[in-house]
Amino acid sequence: MIDILLGGLWGWDGYVTSRGMLGLQAQLQVSGFEVEAFTWDNYKQANAPIIIGYSGGGSRATWLKFPIELMILYDPSPSWQMEPIGTNVKKVICYQNTSPMMLGLGGGVAIGPQVETIMVSEQHLLIQYDQSLHNRTLHAIAAMERGHV
């Protein structure tokens, strides 16, 4: 089971502004995974062992307190709403954007000993369509499923 927390300015708009993440959801489903997407304002509904968050969904993922095997963050935002990664999270991959070019949004930094940071430089809205990052995500999830976290 995988939960995706979408981005968006107000939450409800995530299904429109996070089409790239919904594309990732479809790729995961084709690979046989059960995947549910939530808007960032409904982050408390997430309860899967694998959490993927984009933009506001990425920052909200850091607020989750239940056990998480793998958390993958796509340019979490806003940066000032990021929480240090808790001990409830086994592994984190953060696609940290060095130049999000989105009027102060994007560029969140994941902090914790279990964080692997992948530096990227893309416009914030475009990062969700980056197939090379989606391929990394798919690989990380497959490795976790095989027990190689």
What does each model-identified segment do?
Residues I2-I4, L22-I111:
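Serine-dependent carboxylesterase/thioesterase catalytic core
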Residues W10-G11, P84-V149:
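C-terminal catalytic-base region of ester-bond hydrolases, centering on the histidine
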Residues G14-M21:
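The serine-hydrolase catalytic nucleophile loop
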